[in-house]
A protein has these predicted regions:
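The feature captures the beta-strand-to-loop junction immediately N-terminal to the Walker
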Residues: 65-67
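ABC ATPase NBD coupling module
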Residues: 96-116, 140-144, 214, 253-258
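Conserved ABC ATPase "signature" region
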Residues: 95, 130, 141-159, 206-210
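Conserved catalytic motifs of ABC-family nucleotide-binding domains
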Residues: 184
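Catalytic Walker B motif of ABC-type/P-loop ATPase nucleotide-binding domains
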Residues: 188-192
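Conserved ABC ATPase signature
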Residues: 163-167, 171
């Protein structure tokens, strides 16, 4: 990732939101990038993530994969803001968000879809989306317009009056993504998007992610379903023992002997 690598080298030393005015001088260099550099995390003296750097560009899907206990979930949660960073920086469009809580990152355009069902169970499908629109859009006319557009875009208009709790796994994911887009994010962080989804709905989730990238949204995915994820992403980072083992396209990942030996297995095929 040559361009992102050059950006990473320029981000060193920037630590806090008050530096924003200086960042605006070269904001164009960082626009459309989410870049983490040197992420490190330790628990009780044991380092679980060691100087991990990664990047996501607008309009691409990037996987963050690795075996259980490798540190990928901790790394992912540092990017979302769920886990504080011990060392390293996270920048969104050139703004340092390393010490910001999740809700402030959301204001800068980062959406997050957790593994667990996050629908408002007591609301209808349309009111799940409307609840977010009422926060971000003052005009009722615009709220109604955006609501109809999202229901149509994700093919759930026929379910608008249905209780959200009655949806299937695939329908629920479509609603959750539609609701996340109501806040107009530039990046989406997807935690185990294939978890709890019937096999028949896997292709539906893959199409939803492709739809996000076509919208120009950068997507970072972590998932244990490696075959489904590699069949979807533009690039992937493989984490092993808290460090980046390999970065590249799905073909590069599958062909790498160390990745096959330590993670995928010798018989793995896409």
């Amino acid at each position: 990732m040559p361009q992102s690598a050059s950006l990473l080298s320029r981000l060193s030393g920037r630590r806090s939101a008050p530096a924003a005015p200086a960042l605006r001088k070269d904001a164009a260099s960082f626009k459309g990038t989410l870049i983490a550099q040197g992420l490190t995390k330790a628990y009780k003296g044991r380092t679980v993530v060691n100087s991990v750097s990664l990047g996501v560009r607008a309009g691409e899907a990037v996987g963050l994969l690795g075996p259980n206990g490798a540190g990928k979930t901790t790394c992912f949660y540092m990017v979302t803001g769920l886990v504080p960073v011990d060392k390293g920086t996270i920048e969104i469009d050139g703004f340092d968000v390393s010490s910001m809580p999740m809700y402030r990152r959301a204001r800068l355009g980062v959406g997050y879809l957790p593994q667990e069902a996050s629908i408002f169970r007591g609301l209808t499908v349309e009111n799940n989306i409307r609840a977010v629109l009422e926060v971000v859009e003052k005009s009722r006319k615009e709220r109604d317009k955006n609501l109809d557009a999202l229901l149509d875009e994700f093919h759930i208009a026929h379910l608008r009056k249905a209780p959200a709790i009655s949806l299937s796994g695939g329908e629920r994911r479509r609603l959750e993504i539609a609701r996340a887009l109501a806040s107009r994010p530039n990046y989406m962080l997807l935690d185990e998007p294939f978890a709890g989804v019937d096999p028949i709905a896997v292709s539906d989730i893959q199409q939803l992610v492709r739809h996000l990238t076509k919208r120009g949204i950068g997507v970072l995915i972590t998932d244990h379903n490696v075959r489904e994820t590699l069949g979807l992403i533009d690039r992937a980072y493989i984490i092993h023992a808290g460090e980046i083992l390999k970065h590249g396209s799905a073909a590069d990942i599958v062909a790498d002997p160390d990745v096959r030996r330590l993670y995928l297995g010798e018989g793995f095929t896409l």
